[in-house]
Design a protein with these regions (language model features):
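N-terminal Sec signal peptide and the immediately downstream disordered periplasmic leader
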Residues: 2-85, 206, 210-211, 281, ...
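N-terminal periplasmic accessory domains that precede
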Residues: 79-82, 86, 105-107, 142-145, ...
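Extracytoplasmic beta-strand/coil segments of soluble accessory domains associated
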Residues: 84-128
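Short acidic/polar hinge/loop motifs at secondary-structure boundaries
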Residues: 124-159
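Transmembrane beta-barrel wall of Gram-negative outer-membrane proteins
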Residues: 184, 197-339, 343-362, 548
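Transmembrane beta-strands of outer-membrane beta-barrel pores
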Residues: 192-196, 203, 225-229, 301-305, ...
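Outer-membrane beta-barrel transmembrane domain signature of Gram-negative proteins
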Residues: 343-354, 364, 373, 385-546
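Surface-exposed extracellular loop regions of Gram-negative outer-membrane beta-barrel proteins
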Residues: 375-379, 384, 431-436, 440, ...
Length: 618
């Protein structure tokens, strides 16, 4: 599997792009006419040009059309993997240790991240996932994995900028999933697979069934269940500073000492794809009220879950340190995890959407008026870890919080037939919100041990207070004079005359280790609305030349407005050779999720807690 690491942070306010593409198209000779024309030339694309659909070889921009047979022929059932197999410019990787990226995989099209690609279902915009990939390029795009393969009639991939035609997300291109509209029949498949190493067992069950709604309607429903076990490609942890293999037999035998044994692995640092499972349902329905008027609706519901590991915290690292408790005794997280610990991250993703509308024609005018609602939510759980600042009172599992992306859109599209030209125009209104729900208190709370000497056992001059003297009288080994490990004279003797530093001065991290929870200070809802109007004209200038021009105006409540445009054309030199070219501009404003995303941890320079990291914009 290819893996592409996304490596930049959210750091832009506005993104503008000008694209120019040119390509020479050479078709097959007549000797292959029966096979090639049947399989390629007659593949029709809806995206790329308004008005009547065009074949992929006469489109002014490059479009790939994948049929249901193409999709079914791929061994994978995850839609991300299907597209990666069939579309060379589409890439998606597996990120074993990447916070939310473990559960919603970020993809690229034409080398640009997922939020630069507009995803459509039945030519309607698909809502974004709740995940903002803070570990990569800060992108936020739709979760294509929520679409079951059994629901697909065709997939169109426009590999060209189309922001002027379809909206600001279409910088890299457009992916349009057309759903099945069968009135009868159906399909059922069950797949099982495993890796040669004997792990990663996967089972997938998919099905589709079509029903007639009277004489003039259809209802097609598709469902998928998948379950994939984890793969393990790591080796037992062994580094010069700590080696698991060198530990005693008791360490290996004692289940409580195994950092990850509760999750079924004898390797303290698992490495590979995570455990995942999911149930997904999609429906598509339509009913013709007359020969010129049709009602339609489609939608989905999806639930999936997964879990993966973070990096191993070995005994003696910066997370596992001695602290001095209120009674003067010393405590270490090894009392919870004798062999160190590997945090385990769980994510539950819920996704649902509904689209409804009416389309028809009146004379030379066609219209399509629709409304849609989409929601995607991720709920996190963190286990097998601690909040170090809570000391011996820390729980070992946490609820760090939830992320929710919500969108509502109303859209009207029209086309008017001007004989050899088609005039398209329309408008849309989009309301979107992103919510960060705070985690449970223990996941972000700064406990007593986030500061040095929390129980005031020592004075500023490193002498013992009355409280310190009391715990010493009860048998504590407290030594306030042992306050530094510095050796300014470089004579092998520490400045305070004692080896090491007394645990009373230890300062530890704040929040659930591995993924601190969302605190109320950085939680909340981020909202905006926007509207857009566009016009598009296309047609045959001559028998050989097809041309297209589009203009779009978008206005955001938080990022102002912009006008973008595009021109494209296709020239047919001969039956075998054609030439196409396009030039366009694009504008993209950061999403509410990108503006509101937080990734904050508390650090302690000079012994005082300070929040650092990625904060909400504004």
């Amino acid at each position: 599997m290819k893996q592409k690491k996304l490596h930049t942070a959210v750091r832009y306010a506005l993104t503008g792009l000008t694209l120019f593409t040119t390509s020479l198209l050479v078709q097959a000779q007549e000797v292959t006419e029966e096979t090639t024309e049947a399989k390629d030339l007659e593949r029709i694309a809806v995206v790329g040009a308004r008005g009547a659909p065009r074949s992929v070889t006469s489109s002014p921009v490059p479009v790939d059309v994948l049929t249901a047979e193409d999709v079914e022929a791929v061994a994978f059932t995850d839609m991300n993997n299907v597209l990666m197999t069939l579309v060379p410019s589409y890439s998606v990787g597996r990120q074993p240790i990447s916070d939310g990226g473990t559960f919603i995989r970020p993809a690229t099209l034409r080398g640009m991240p997922t939020d630069k690609t507009l995803v459509l279902v039945n030519s309607k915009r698909r809502h974004r996932a709740a995940l903002v990939s803070i570990g990569g390029s800060g992108t936020q795009g739709p979760d294509i994995a929520t679409i079951p393969t059994a629901a697909i009639q065709s997939v169109e991939v426009l590999r060209d900028g189309a922001a002027a035609q379809y909206g600001s997300d279409a910088i890299a291109g457009v992916i349009n999933f057309q759903l099945k509209n069968n009135t009868e029949g159906g399909s059922f498949t069950a797949d099982y697979g495993s890796y040669y190493e004997g792990d990663g067992d996967q089972i997938t069950v998919t099905g589709n069934k079509g029903f007639a709604l009277g004489d003039d309607g259809f209802f097609s429903i598709s469902a998928e269940y998948s379950d994939s076990e984890a793969t393990f490609r790591g080796e037992q942890y062994c580094e010069p500073w700590f080696c698991v293999d060198d530990q005693s037999d008791q360490y290996i035998a004692d289940a409580t000492a195994m950092a990850n044994s509760v999750h079924g692995s004898d390797v303290v640092q698992p490495w590979g794809q995570p455990n995942t499972s999911g149930t997904r349902v999609f429906f598509n329905a339509g009913y013709a009220l007359s020969s010129e008027l049709e009602l339609y609706a489609f939608g989905n519901y999806s639930e999936s879950e997964g879990d993966g590991s973070f990096y191993y915290r070995y005994p003696g690292n910066g997370t596992i340190e001695d602290i001095r408790l209120e009674d003067g005794s010393i405590w270490n997280p090894l009392e919870f995890f004798p062999g160190g610990f590997t945090p385990r991250f769980f994510g539950d993703v819920t996704d649902y959407a509904f689209v409804g509308g009416v389309k028809g024609m009146s004379g030379d005018l066609t219209y399509d008026i629709s409304g849609r609602y989409g929601n995607n939510e991720i709920s996190y759980t963190l286990a097998n870890t601690i909040n170090p600042s809570l000391g011996n009172e820390s729980p070992t599992s946490f609820k760090p919080g939830d992320l929710t992306n919500e969108e509502t859109q109303i859209q009207a599209d029209f086309t008017y037939d001007l004989n050899q030209y088609v005039l398209a125009f329309g408008a849309s209104y989009l309301d979107e919100s992103y919510e960060i729900s705070e985690g449970e208190l223990s996941s972000y709370f700064a406990g007593s041990y986030a500061t040095s000497d929390p129980w005031e056992f020592c004075n500023d001059d490193y002498t013992t207070t009355a409280l310190g003297a009391a715990v010493i009288a009860n048998g504590s080994t407290l030594n306030c004079a042992n306050y530094t490990s510095a050796d300014s004279n470089d004579d092998g003797v520490e400045d305070d005359g004692f080896a090491g530093v007394d645990a009373v001065y230890t300062v530890v991290g704040v929040g659930s280790n591995g993924f601190p929870g969302y605190s109320p200070d950085y939680s909340g809802s981020y909202e905006r609305d926007s509207y857009a109007v566009y016009t598009d004209i296309s047609g045959d200038i001559t028998d050989e030349l097809f041309a297209q021009a589009a203009l779009r105006y978008e206005d955001y409540s938080d990022f102002g407005s912009e006008v973008v445009y595009k021109v494209a054309g296709f020239y047919q030199f001969s039956d075998e050779v054609g030439f196409r070219s396009s030039f366009g501009t694009g504008f993209r404003a950061p999403t509410p999720g990108q503006q509101g995303t937080t990734n904050v941890s508390t650090r302690l320079p000079d012994g005082f807690p300070v929040a650092t990291g990625l904060f909400p914009a504004g």
